[in-house]
Amino acid sequence: NALFILGNIGNNDVNYAFPDRAIEEIRFYVPFITEAVANATREIIR
């Protein structure tokens, strides 16, 4: 048995990665971040 936890990056990570960026620009990246987390989850489950 194993337990693993994956999730989207936190607010601090977003603030660090995208300083001085408009929220609209940051929102562009949300689907890519979500897809990366979903893909990683699928790989771990396999």
Curated annotation (Swiss-Prot):
Keyword terms, alphabetized: Alkaloid metabolism, Glycoprotein, Hydrolase
Presence of the UniProt keyword Glycoprotein in the record: yes
Glycosites: N39
Highest taxon of the lineage: Eukaryota
Enzyme class: hydrolase
Record's function text: Deacetylates 17-O-acetylajmaline and 17-O-acetylnorajmaline, but is inactive toward other acetylated alkaloids.
Keyword rRNA processing belongs to the record: no
GO biological-process terms attached to the record: alkaloid metabolic process
Catalyzed reaction equations: 17-O-acetylajmaline + H2O = ajmaline + acetate + H(+); 17-O-acetylnorajmaline + H2O = norajmaline + acetate + H(+)
This protein's name: Acetylajmalan esterase
Protein family (similarity comment): Belongs to the 'GDSL' lipolytic enzyme family.
Organism this protein belongs to: Rauvolfia verticillata (Common devil-pepper)
The protein's Enzyme Commission number: 3.1.1.80
MF terms (GO), sorted A to Z: acetylajmaline esterase activity
